């Protein structure tokens, strides 16, 4: 588990990826530290502007925990590719800064796993379920 301060997950546990680095979790974290509710797109824009310390803190937290979470997957199953879905997959920096954080935690000194945005955007899971 990543960080139990994210609160209870819908699965009944705490510290799950969903409660720490999903879009809603990032929005909740930003609101908690800043007192201001913003959506993920607004947080990302403020991060890029560089003038909002809470957006900076929120995004740096995302990259750090993303690196830890994804490195566990890579260290265990060594996938050729990972598709980053959901709102977080729309953040361009996840494919640069986030991947740099992954590199810090993988067993191998080089990272061969490729990272992709889903071709179907945020609806990839819905389309996949429909095909079942």
Residue map of PLM features:
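ATP-binding/phosphotransfer module of carbohydrate and carboxylate kinases, centering on a glycine-rich
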Residues: 4-132
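Short glycine-rich, Thr/Ser-proximal phosphate-binding strand/loop in the N-terminal lobe
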Residues: 1
């Amino acid at each position: 588990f990543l960080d139990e301060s994210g609160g209870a997950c819908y699965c009944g546990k705490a510290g799950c990826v969903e409660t720490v680095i999903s879009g809603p979790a990032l929005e909740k974290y930003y609101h908690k530290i800043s007192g201001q509710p913003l959506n993920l797109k607004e947080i990302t824009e403020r991060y890029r502007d560089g003038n909002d310390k809470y957006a900076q803190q929120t995004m740096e937290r995302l990259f750090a925990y993303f690196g830890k979470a994804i490195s566990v997957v890579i260290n265990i199953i060594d996938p050729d590719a990972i598709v980053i879905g959901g709102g977080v997959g729309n953040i361009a920096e996840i494919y640069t800064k986030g991947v740099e954080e992954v590199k810090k935690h993988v067993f191998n000194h080089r990272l061969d796993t490729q990272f992709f945005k889903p071709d179907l955007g945020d609806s990839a899971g819905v389309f996949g379920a429909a095909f079942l």
